[in-house]
Regions:
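Alpha-helical scaffold segments that mediate packing/assembly in large oligomeric complexes
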Residues: 111-207
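Assembly/oligomerization interface modules of large self-assembling protein complexes
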Residues: 26-108, 129, 160-170
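Short glycine-rich, low-complexity/disordered patches
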Residues: 22-37, 141-153, 219-223
Length: 281
């Protein structure tokens, strides 16, 4: 490490120690709550997708993850000459449980790369930004691919971090099975095409909304489709893989720029499993 790099690196570590009110960061310490919240915010900001989802910090390792929903109407009328007005509780409690497991983010950056960054005035921002970005990407990868939690993980056998923790899709499979469509005419798979269960992916998304989502939420303007980029390409590739007059090409470009499935906005998310679709808000 060059002397200039060492100077900037030491200054960065001193600043990190000051933020956490410790003498040195070379010793184990608990991250200060305000720093922890700022770090969480920066991890979310490192990813356009993470900015669109809710993330809650909790104090307890385990507990109830209680979701609040509105399931019944409240509009009514009462003849107060004879009866008192009665308030109604419109909420339904969708109670599930969480258990936080320690996840290590052990990071090493070679001196050569630090030397390259040392010439920039925003050295520390680059240094910490790379780590935050990778942590954000790992969170997304686990969220969509995690199926289990191992005492010692194996990156070779599980390159998509399947054994680090149970992800969002796995939690759906285990805790919300009534809203998971996994089979068509054949057990364990759904086919799309002329002879398939659905003629196209739009019909599949329509079924998911009509049959898997409560009626009160079916017209929610925040509903979106999450899928793999390949799934999006499979739908729109026929539009571009042909000779077209300019007018038709323009129409195709407009359609592709406003990617939708069953009129819902589509987001191709990093690390999302192929042959999987999630309709959510």
């Amino acid at each position: 490490m060059r002397n200039e790099t060492r100077f900037k690196y030491n200054a960065a570590m001193a600043q990190l120690a000051k933020l956490n009110n410790v003498e040195k960061v070379s010793h184990k310490f608990n991250v200060a709550p305000t720093v922890q919240q700022k770090l969480e915010d920066k991890i979310q900001l490192s990813s356009a997708f993470l900015q669109k989802i809710n993330v809650f910090l909790v104090d307890e390792q385990s507990g109830s993850a209680v979701g609040l929903g509105i399931s019944r109407p409240t509009a009514s009328r009462t003849n107060t000459d004879t009866n008192d007005r009665q308030a109604k509780d419109p909420s339904n409690m969708d109670e599930r449980f969480y258990f936080c497991r320690k996840t290590d983010f052990d990071t090493a950056i070679k001196y050569q790369k630090l030397d390259q960054w040392a010439k920039f005035k925003d050295f520390y921002a680059r240094f910490s930004g790379q780590i935050q970005k990778r942590q954000g990407l790992d969170r997304i990868m686990i969220g969509f691919n995690g199926t289990s939690f191992a005492a010692t993980t194996d990156i070779v056998a599980n390159p998509k971090l399947q054994d680090v923790n149970k992800g969002w899709l796995q939690k759906m499979r285990e805790e919300n099975v009534a809203r998971v469509l996994s089979s068509g005419t054949a057990q364990g798979k759904i086919t799309i095409g002329k002879l398939g269960d659905y003629k196209n992916v739009d019909a599949l998304v329509m079924t998911l909304v009509d049959e898997m989502i409560d009626e009160v939420h079916q017209d929610n303007p925040d509903l979106v489709v999450l899928c793999n980029r390949k799934t999006v390409a499979d739908k729109y590739f026929p539009l571009v893989n042909q000779d077209q007059p300019n007018s038709e090409k323009l129409a195709a470009d407009i359609i592709i720029s406003q990617k939708r499935m069953d009129n819902l906005p589509v987001y191709a998310v990093p690390f999302f499993p192929e042959d999987t679709i999630l309709v959510t808000t």
